[in-house]
Amino acid sequence: MTKTWFVTGTSRGMGRELVEQLLARGDRVAATLRRPAQLDDLAAQHGDRLWRRALDVTDADDVRAAMDEAFAAHDRIDVVVSNAGYGIFGAAEDLTDTQIDEVIATNLTGSIQLARAALPHLRAQGGGLLMQMSSMGGYMTFPAFSLYHATKWGIEGFYDAMAAEVEPFGIRTTLVAPGIVRTGFFDAATRVPFSAPYRGGPADGTPTTADEMAVDPVRVVAAMIRAADADVPPRRLVLGTDAYTLITDALTGRLAEVAGQRDNAATADFAAPPQAREC
């Protein structure tokens, strides 16, 4: 059965790959990006199965308008994929206020507003799937990635809470957590020069090389499509052995830290249960 998808950030990388695979299998796609002409080649091949619109995900009004227009143009949208975002690498102290605001506006606030804009439509049609591109960086951290991690940890928390709110309406959510995918993500990322105190420190180094990117974007996208086709899509989709290993190590270490706080945690409890208030 064919599906209709709404996808952000489709100009390159996994967003573009997702659009290509969906169209190749006969699905319909509402694709958004800053410059729709970047998909002219796909439009020529697939005609009206590809709907395009310019979108700035940092503009909440534009996000709502794009979602309204996409749902109006299609009988139903089965899957909404939030994929727009970018990386920034540098020591936390060296980041500028503007850089912080812009990354949060795109990676976190933009994703939140996209989900909020889709929810009324998904409720009205009786359900659907919200799929959010997260990262293994939503569970663990590397030096020099502090701001990027903040946005991924933030969207993980938002989706976890929202999932329980929307499940009664037949709306499912999936957080996609790939490892280091071999795309142009690192090339396109903003790199903040290290100030003198941080040069040569833990943060000062090449984030990764092409040879270290072990995750295939084509296979990541294929796994996303399989997840969307499942009767019950997974709440989390971990993709890549590196992601599985690093997430497992991080969560195991965090649980050990919490376990070590068991006795200390109890010291904050009331000495005796609080008395019930009289009405």
Task: Report residues per predicted region.
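Active-site loop immediately N-terminal to the catalytic Tyr-X3-Lys motif
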Residues: 93, 140-146
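The beta1-alpha1 cofactor-binding region of Rossmann-like NAD(H)/NADP(H)-dependent oxidoreductases
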Residues: 55-65, 97
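Active-site helix of classical SDR
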Residues: 115, 151
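Conserved glycine-rich cofactor-binding loop
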Residues: 11-13
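Substrate-binding pocket helix/loop in short-chain dehydrogenase/reductase
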Residues: 91-92, 96-101
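SDR active-site lid
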Residues: 168-234
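Residue(s) in the substrate-gating loop at a strand-loop-helix junction
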Residues: 135
